[in-house]
Design a protein with these regions (language model features):
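Charged phosphate-binding loop/patch that engages nucleotide di/tri-phosphates or the phosphate backbone
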Residues: 2, 130-152
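Active-site metal-binding core of divalent-cation-utilizing nuclease and nuclease-like domains
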Residues: 2-16, 35-65
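Conserved alpha-helical elements of sugar-nucleotide-dependent glycosyltransferases
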Residues: 18-26, 84-88
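Conserved catalytic cores of phosphodiester-cleaving nucleases, focusing on short active-site segments
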Residues: 30, 58-75
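A structural signal for short, well-ordered beta-strand segments and their strand-loop junctions
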Residues: 37, 68-70, 100-103
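Short catalytic/ligand-binding loop motif for oxyanion handling, primarily in non-cytosolic enzymes
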Residues: 70, 77-78, 108-113
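Active-site-adjacent loop/helix micro-motif of nuclease/hydrolase catalytic cores
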Residues: 75-86
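Nucleic-acid nuclease catalytic cores
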Residues: 90-119
Length: 152
C-alpha cells in the first residue's frame, strides 16, 4: 500500500479492504452478533445487478440488543452514504428489528451508533450536502461532527 489516503485509492484497491477494520472493531465491541449480509462475494462479477435491498443487506444481526446493524468506516473525510443504500436501509428498518448504523472512525479510533430513523433526522435537520461519485451515483456527505460518538 502506498502513502496515498485510502479514499483516494482506486476502487479496486479499496474493495480489497473496505469494511475490514470497521467490522473487526464492531465484532470486538459487541456480543450476540452473527454475520448477516454479503462480504465482497467472490466470483460474483455481476453483483451490482441484484436489487438494492439484497445488495445492501445489513452486515450483522444481533440478539442483545435485538437489531440489524450496518457497519461503515470513515477516516478524515465525511461519511458517504449512497442514496440507493439509504433507500435499502429504509426497507430493512421496516422489519421488526430496528436497523442501526454503526460507524468506525479510523481517525478517532472510536465508534458512533445511530438508529436509522435518527440518521434520517440528522440528514434532514442539518441540511447534509449531496455529492456525486465518479460513476454518477449520489451520496449524502455526513460530517463526523454530526454523529453521536461513544463517550461524547
Amino acid at each position: 500500500m502506498t502513502n496515498q489516503p485510502f479514499h483516494q485509492a482506486s476502487y479496486n484497491h479499496r474493495f480489497q479492504f473496505m469494511g475490514d477494520e470497521a467490522e473487526t472493531a464492531f465484532e470486538e465491541r459487541n456480543t450476540q452478533w452473527a454475520r448477516f449480509g454479503f462480504n465482497r462475494p467472490e466470483g460474483m462479477t455481476k453483483f451490482h445487478y441484484l436489487p438494492h435491498v439484497i445488495r445492501y443487506t445489513p452486515d450483522y444481526v444481533q440478539a442483545d440488543p435485538t437489531r440489524l446493524v450496518e457497519v461503515m468506516g470513515m477516516g478524515k473525510t465525511p461519511l458517504k452514504i449512497k442514496m440507493e443504500k439509504i433507500a435499502a436501509m429504509q426497507w430493512w428498518d421496516g422489519l421488526e428489528a430496528p436497523l442501526y448504523l454503526w460507524v468506525w472512525s479510523s481517525t478517532r479510533q472510536n465508534f458512533a451508533q445511530v438508529k436509522f430513523r435518527e440518521l434520517m433526522n440528522i440528514i434532514n435537520k442539518n441540511d447534509v450536502p449531496l455529492g456525486n461519485f465518479a460513476e454518477g451515483k449520489k451520496y449524502f456527505s455526513i460530517s463526523s461532527k454530526l454523529l453521536p460518538w461513544d463517550g461524547d
